[in-house]
């Protein structure tokens, strides 16, 4: 049986922490859809198109992964794809509190909806898009925080 999942997020930008979760999901699922959210409630550093492009570049060598953008409810996206499972990364207890609430909200919208949580490896547990943006803003080296194949694209931010 072919089992697929969706890994949603803003990916602003995609990080080595995200890649860690993607690779772990690929060990469990046959197909992983990385779904880049438009999320108008946030003010992204990278525009929507850039975030999709960065995610596609970062995952291009992982055959099980595809990247899409979405601007609707995650549950509606999942239903439209015939997928009832999403994966999320958990770095700390604070992540769990937030993700638990979101998971319950999604399950209340669709009873078949499941959320699977992955912990990143210790070397990536501290990495967040916020940290990458902060280091980038102050001219620091983000080379160990993001996939090498998107490093120059991130440094040459277009939007």
UniProtKB/Swiss-Prot annotation:
What family does the Swiss-Prot or TrEMBL record give for this protein? Belongs to the bacterial CoaD family.
Keywords assigned by UniProt?
ATP-binding, Coenzyme A biosynthesis, Cytoplasm, Magnesium, Nucleotide-binding, Nucleotidyltransferase, Transferase
Q: Where is this site: Transition state stabilizer?
A: 18
Q: Which Pfam families match?
A: CTP_transf_like
According to UniProt, the name of this protein is Phosphopantetheine adenylyltransferase
Organism placement in taxonomy: Bacteria, Pseudomonadati, Campylobacterota, Epsilonproteobacteria, Campylobacterales
Indicate the enzyme's highest-level EC class.
Answer: transferase
**The protein's Enzyme Commission number:** 2.7.7.3
Give the highest taxon in the source lineage. Answer: Bacteria
Biological or metabolic pathway of the protein: Cofactor biosynthesis; coenzyme A biosynthesis; CoA from (R)-pantothenate: step 4/5
Where on this chain does substrate bind?
10, 42, 74, 88
Necessary cofactors:
Mg(2+)
**GO BP term (any one):** coenzyme A biosynthetic process
Query: Where is the protein localized?
Result: Cytoplasm
Where is it predominantly found?
Answer: cytoplasm
Q: Could you give one GO CC term from the UniProt record?
A: cytoplasm
Q: Which residues bind ATP?
A: 10-11, 18, 89-91, 99, 124-130
Q: Quaternary state and partners of this protein?
A: Homohexamer.
The reaction(s) this protein catalyses: (R)-4'-phosphopantetheine + ATP + H(+) = 3'-dephospho-CoA + diphosphate
Name a GO molecular-function annotation.
Answer: ATP binding
Task: Outline what the protein does.
Answer: Reversibly transfers an adenylyl group from ATP to 4'-phosphopantetheine, yielding dephospho-CoA (dPCoA) and pyrophosphate.
